[in-house]
């Protein structure tokens, strides 16, 4: 992992707007340092997981362990908040370098308000999502994705395409 990876990954994490969600749950006097720690840990874990993806040895349990590590290291964040940045980075890495490789079946769909809203039921904030609820949501996503012949990580591709269309890029 070099400076360019870190810079790109930081830009992507910032674009996910996870700081907004973290800002609503972290104490004001600790918010800045904890968000910095979140970004640092997410980038460190991404370095390890992207190397495994590149070697085609990445497993879903590796991702979940990394998410547990991030969540446990930062008081006041939920599993739902911990997952956002890392899952987006893994998704981007897979689409750029490994699209079509079966390793995509190991990846989860990044949860956000749009994805959660598409699953129906009451709207749930990332701050309220614990690991069991996260796993349940990923299984729901898997059911929908299988119907379309896609991996879980591709479930939110529809909104990516909509956004690009709105910007005149598709």
What are these regions (language model features)?
Residues 1-19, 23, 29, 64, ...:
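C-terminal accessory module of base-excision DNA glycosylases/AP lyases that mediates lesion recognition
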Residues 29-73:
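A glycine-rich, hydrophobic loop/mini-helix early in the fold
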């Amino acid at each position: 992992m070099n400076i360019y990876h870190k810079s790109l990954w930081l830009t992507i994490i910032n674009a996910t707007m996870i700081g907004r969600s973290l800002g609503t749950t972290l104490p004001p006097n600790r918010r800045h340092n904890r968000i910095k720690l979140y970004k640092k840990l997410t980038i460190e874990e991404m370095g390890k997981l992207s190397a495994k993806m590149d070697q085609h040895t990445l497993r879903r349990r590796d991702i979940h362990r990394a998410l547990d590590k991030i969540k446990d290291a930062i008081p006041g964040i939920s599993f739902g908040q911990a997952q956002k940045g890392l899952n987006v980075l893994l998704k981007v890495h897979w689409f750029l370098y490994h699209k079509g490789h079966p390793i995509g079946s190991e990846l989860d769909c990044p949860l956000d308000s749009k994805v959660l809203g598409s699953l129906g039921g009451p709207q749930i904030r990332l701050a309220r999502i614990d690991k069991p609820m996260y796993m349940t949501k990923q299984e729901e996503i898997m059911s929908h994705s299988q119907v379309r012949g896609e991996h879980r990580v591709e479930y939110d591709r529809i909104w990516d395409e909509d956004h690009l269309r709105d910007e005149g890029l598709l």
